[in-house]
């Protein structure tokens, strides 16, 4: 079997001239609140990006992400326009949302609802009315991609925090979303589990062409771009890959962004010459090298030109395009 091509994924999913997320003049106020948590916010994320949404507690980053997912959108006074892959979130049906937008919570205990790993991965598929044969195929493909095939009959309660979060990610990806939103997904993980989770997330972005947006308190050097949100506005944007020393981009103080200002309007254009230079976060070989990372690296991912989605491998080595 051919080893995975680490070059940029082709196709619509990684088109830097198209937006995966488009937010215009967004304002949102929680019931009973004296002030809006988001006010006149403009924000755009290109397709295929690995983006960080960085801000402190109360900055509005979690609210912004949840508003892009109709099933979990908070109650409150809302104005403005939100679009995902060109479709208005306000008009998006639940099925379309499930198949377009994936969401991973900070705490996997808030996301895992089934007793076994297999049933957790099949839960969303069953809710969409998928046939049992198709569910089995999806679970097999996704578990193999993430290296979870040996976990399928394990009780979810027996998994470590890092494995639970990886399971949450895999269960979401079984639905084949094209945009993936994550709210502080590694804040409760130890350093080894965090590195393995980020490596899996990086593969989802690079190999499947999935646009990834991660909300974090502090910026990290592994992203394509970072957006700083403060007082309900996207204040600044950094093109992480175009700067020499990405490790020293930001100070611990969130006011230390002056040296990396690339744009003021919350719109980032991903430069094609930056794509090939990106590497997985950290030295993966120094992390706890689990069997899932070794096995899954043997497959070639392919992008569907019809819908811009990536491809999950079959367990026999052939590939299945996302539907």
Task: Identify the meaning behind each predicted range.
Residues 17-23, 28-40, 72-75, 91-93, ...:
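A short, flexible loop at the N-terminus of ABC-type nucleotide-binding domains that lies
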Residues 69:
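Helix-to-loop junction immediately C-terminal to a conserved catalytic motif
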Residues 77-88, 97:
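Conserved ABC transporter NBD signature motif
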Residues 133-151:
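Conserved ABC ATPase "signature" region
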Residues 155-159, 163:
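Conserved ABC ATPase signature
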Residues 176:
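Conserved catalytic motifs of ABC-family nucleotide-binding domains
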Residues 180-183:
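Catalytic Walker B motif of ABC-type/P-loop ATPase nucleotide-binding domains
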């Amino acid at each position: 079997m051919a080893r995975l091509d680490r070059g940029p994924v082709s196709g619509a999913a990684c088109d830097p001239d198209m937006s995966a997320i488009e937010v215009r003049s967004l304002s949102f106020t929680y019931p009973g609140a004296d002030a809006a948590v988001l006010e006149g916010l403009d924000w755009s994320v290109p397709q295929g990006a690995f983006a960080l949404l960085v801000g402190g507690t109360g900055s509005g980053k979690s609210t912004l992400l949840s508003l892009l997912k109709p099933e979990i959108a908070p109650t409150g006074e809302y104005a403005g326009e939100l679009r995902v892959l060109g479709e208005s979130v306000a008009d998006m049906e639940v099925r379309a949302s499930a198949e377009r937008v994936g969401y991973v919570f900070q705490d996997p205990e808030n996301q895992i609802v089934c007793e076994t790993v297999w049933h957790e991965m099949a839960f969303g598929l069953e809710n969409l009315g998928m046939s049992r044969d198709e569910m089995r195929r999806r679970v097999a493909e996704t578990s193999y991609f993430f290296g979870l095939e040996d976990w399928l009959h394990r009780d979810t309660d027996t998994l470590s925090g890092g494995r639970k979060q990886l399971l949450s990610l895999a269960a979401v990806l079984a639905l084949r979303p094209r945009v993936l939103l994550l709210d502080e997904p590694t804040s409760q993980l130890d350093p080894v589990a965090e590195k393995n989770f980020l490596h899996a997330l990086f593969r989802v972005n690079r190999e499947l062409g999935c646009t990834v947006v991660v909300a974090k308190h502090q910026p990290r050097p592994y992203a394509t771009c970072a957006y700083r949100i403060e007082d309900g506005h996207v204040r600044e944007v950094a093109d992480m890959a175009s700067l020499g020393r990405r490790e020293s981009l930001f100070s611990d103080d969130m006011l230390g962004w002056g040296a990396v200002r690339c744009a003021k309007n919350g719109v980032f254009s991903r430069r094609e010459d930056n794509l090939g230079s990106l590497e997985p976060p950290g030295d993966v070989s120094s992390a706890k090298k689990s069997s899932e990372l070794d096995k899954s690296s043997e497959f070639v991912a392919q992008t569907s030109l019809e819908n811009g989605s990536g491809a999950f491998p079959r367990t026999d080595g052939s590939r299945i395009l996302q539907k």
